[in-house]
Regions:
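Interfacial segments of alpha-helical transmembrane regions
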Residues: 1-10
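C-terminal TM-helix exit segments that contain a strictly Trp-centered aromatic cap at the helix terminus
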Residues: 12-21, 83-85
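Membrane-embedded catalytic cores of phosphoryl/pyrophosphoryl-handling enzymes
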Residues: 29-121
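Membrane-interfacial helix-loop-helix modules of multi-pass inner-membrane proteins that assemble, modify
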Residues: 17-33
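Generic recognition of short, well-ordered alpha-helical interface segments
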Residues: 10-11, 48
Length: 121
């Protein structure tokens, strides 16, 4: 699930960047970044990774405090990854929102269709 979420999210992100082709913010010229701005690949990939890892951990976890800790960690890591992009000046806020939404949608869809015999828990 984790590999499928990250690899599929990366491919989906690349296709969307080619299709939309939005240029990066002008402040991105200060740093070495390549490619289109929309959607944020870091936000999409980070969301896919952290949500997939959380789903795998939650599948094997029955303790309510541990489940809350896993969810909190995933949320914090997604938010920190997402916020780093506009702070560094390499993405617009809308790029990041689209990246998080895309990563979340892709991973939840993948988790839903994943073969039942390969699911954890």
């Amino acid at each position: 699930l984790v590999l499928g979420a990250v690899a599929g999210g990366w491919m989906l992100n690349g296709a969307l960047k080619l299709w939309i082709g939005r240029p990066r913010p002008s402040t991105a010229a200060v740093t070495e970044v390549f490619g289109s701005s929309f959607p944020s690949g870091h936000a999409m990939g980070g969301t896919a990774l952290w949500v997939a890892l959380a789903l795998v951990c939650l599948a094997g976890c029955r303790s309510v405090p541990a489940r809350r800790a896993v969810l909190a960690a995933a949320v914090v890591l997604v938010v920190l990854t997402a916020l780093s992009r506009p702070v560094l000046g390499v993405h617009y806020f809308s790029d990041v929102l689209a990246g998080v939404a895309g990563g979340l949608a892709w991973t939840l869809w993948l988790a839903r269709i994943w073969p039942p015999e390969q699911k954890l828990g």
